[in-house]
Structures are given as C-alpha cells and as structure tokens.
From Swiss-Prot:
The chain crosses the membrane at residues 52-72, 104-124. Keywords: Cytoplasmic vesicle, Endocytosis, Endonuclease, Hydrogen ion transport, Hydrolase, Ion transport, Membrane, Nuclease, Transmembrane, Transmembrane helix, Transport. This is Ribonuclease kappa. It is an enzyme of class 3 (hydrolase). GO terms for molecular function: RNA endonuclease activity. GO terms for biological process: endosomal lumen acidification; Golgi lumen acidification; intracellular pH reduction; lysosomal lumen acidification; proton transmembrane transport; receptor-mediated endocytosis; receptor-mediated endocytosis of virus by host cell; vacuolar acidification.
Length: 137
C-alpha cells in the first residue's frame, strides 16, 4: 500500500479503496463524467440502416399524404371512390359529400404529421448512431 512508506503518514488512505466505496463517494478531485452519453446511448433502438430507411419512408409518406390532403380539400372528382359516403349522403345535395371530402383531407394531414414525427425519430436515431461510432468503450 502506498501509505506505508517511510515518512509522515497521510491523513487518509489513497483513493484506491474499493470500487463500491469510490462509486458511492467519488473523490472531489476526480474529473466528473457527464451522464449524458450513457443516457443518449440508451435511447438508441434502431440501427443505422433501419433509421435511414425510416427517414426515406417518412419523407415519401409526408409528401404523398400532404398532396392527397390538398387534392381532397379541393374536392377532386378523381378521388370520389375514396370518400366513405352512403346513399343517405346524396339526399341533401353536394354539401354532405364536400364535408366528407374535407374530413378525409383532415385525416390525410393528421397522418402526414404522424409520418413527420416518425421521420424526426428516425433522424434522431441516425444522429445517435453517428455519435455511438465516436464513443470510446
């Protein structure tokens, strides 16, 4: 042990006491590590290829659903087959059909927002994968 050398005895033993002791009571002179890298690495749940695939698919989904939402909002006649109407909706004129068109367009915009959130999650996974490459183990 280092404190058994001849000469004046130090007031406390060296910092190599035990792992359990040093883990619970870190030395005030020891450099502190930020818990951020471990916490950020624990959020990593997709590999780099899956995250890139998620970005591509979500970008395509956002573009397609926004365009569909716009076309439903302007009451495109080509999309009449995709509007969920019944025979009762035709009785009171076209206003009921227009309301159904607008409801489907809102649904498309909501789905585009969900795809945008998925793209943001995939982008975060790509960033975490890149950060993981630079981490030292």
């Amino acid at each position: 042990m280092g404190w058994l050398r001849p000469g004046p005895r130090p007031l406390c033993p060296p910092a190599r006491a035990s792992w359990a002791f040093s883990h619970r009571f870190p030395s005030p002179l020891a450099p502190r590590r930020s818990p951020t890298p471990f916490f950020m690495a624990s959020l990593l749940c997709c590999g780099p290829k899956l995250a890139a695939c998620g970005i591509v698919l979500s970008a395509w989904g956002v573009i397609m659903l926004i365009m569909l939402g716009i076309f439903f909002n302007v009451h495109s006649a080509v999309l009449i087959e995709d509007v969920p109407f019944t025979e009762k909706d035709f009785e009171n004129g076209p206003q009921n059909i227009y309301n159904l068109y607008e409801q489907v367009s809102y649904n498309c915009f909501i789905a585009a927002g969900l795809y945008l959130l998925l793209g943001g999650f995939s982008f975060c996974q790509v960033r975490l994968n890149k950060r993981k490459e630079y981490m030292v183990r």
